[in-house]
Structures are given as structure tokens and as C-alpha cells.
Amino acid sequence: AQRVDELENVNIRTTTCPFPPKTVLADPERKHFIYNDYHMSAASRKLHDKDLCNYVPLTYHEGPSFYERDYVAADVALIKVAPMDKHGFFNLGTALSLTPLFCDTAKTVIVEVNENVPICLGGCRESIHISEVDYIVEGDNQPMIQLPELPIADTDKKIAAIVLEEIEDGACLQLGIGAMPNAVGAMIAQSDLKDLGVHTEMLVDSFVDMYEAGRITGRRKQLDKCKMAYTFAMGTNKLYNFLDGNPACAIY
């Protein structure tokens, strides 16, 4: 964003960005940056209504083929990572998902080191080796994104109560973003349910509450037994501190 007047026709691709990118704010007439989002957040939808964001229609499972078939070859993959460990690996942090594929297919791989990125242990390629990196940026250690806690309305509570009745001991959970999933998580944490498992796209703060209340053990899971499997996490420092080096969680 600081180099806005030096650059032209720069395509930026991201997904579920919770806040307007600085590149968009620095270029409100889209003369320099073209912002694209695969899975539009509330912030991206508002930008789209102002013609400041392109929506890329892509269902999640299509992501690998989208890149492997070179439909959208990237020149640069810029990834935020944790500091390098003694073996030369940078942990990719809270958003694994398609990140290894971005690195595999980009012409240039740049990592920005941030000491606040938690070490997220996983099941497959949760780290990138220094030999696979072209450039390293020593950043200013920006804080992790904090998702504000949304107020839970009476309607959310009523829906959550209905959902809770359908959950049995040993059930496997997936929760998304918003007040209603948080309400479900809060009620589960206060319930007497046992041995729940987690296999979710997104990990949020309410999973921490359920785990610490003893509701989540994963003992009855057949896949990733005794682990909470997820592909990205977004919440507050309570969640990020919980994830840091935690073998009870597995990111994919």
C-alpha cells in the first residue's frame, strides 16, 4: 500500500479477509491494485458493492484443481509465518488450507516472519522449509487478527437450544463463524455431553471453552482420534494461545 504510486495492475488474491486490505484503502479508484476474494467476508461484500473487490466464484473443494491446472498462476505467494525453528522450518500458522499449494505453484515465495503467529501442529505440511523460500521479510510483529465477540441474541439462543437437543455423546462437531455457532458452543460447554470430537473447517474460541470444560476428547473419532482437526482458525488471543504447540489440535 505504501508503494501505491509505483505499481500498476497488481492482482491481489485472498479469501475471507475480515477487514478491508490496506491496498484497497490506498487505491480507492482501482488504478493500481485489483483485489479479488474467493470467499467473501462482510468486509469484502461491502467493497464489492463499491466496485472495489472482485468475487471469484470457487467452491472450496475446487481450490486444488484451480491452482494445479494453472487457471490462476501466481507470480508471488506472500505468507505470514512463525519464526524459523532449529530444523529450518517456518510454521504456517493458523491458516493451512491451500497455503502449501500456493507455495508450490507460485513463481516466488516470500515469507513474513511474525513472532505472534502460533505454532499450529498438523497432519500434513504445516511448515515450509527455508530451502523452499525465495525471500524472508522480518516484519514488525503485528498482532494476530482479533475477531470481536458478537452479541448473542435471543433468536440465536433459541436456535442453539434446538441444535443442542440433536447432539449425542461422541458426536463430531463443526462450527462456523457468528453469534449462533458461539451460542451453540457455549451451551455445549455448560452441558453434560461427553467425548465429543471436532472435525471442522474453522476453529473458533468456543472450541476452547468446550475443550476446557471437558466436553471435547475426540476419543470416539475414527479419523484423527483424540485430535481437533481443522483447516484454519480465527478468533482472539484465547484461541491462538490455546493452539500454540498444542498436540490436541491438527491443522490440515
Task: List PLM regions with ranges.
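Conserved alpha/beta enzyme-core scaffold
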Residues: 1-252
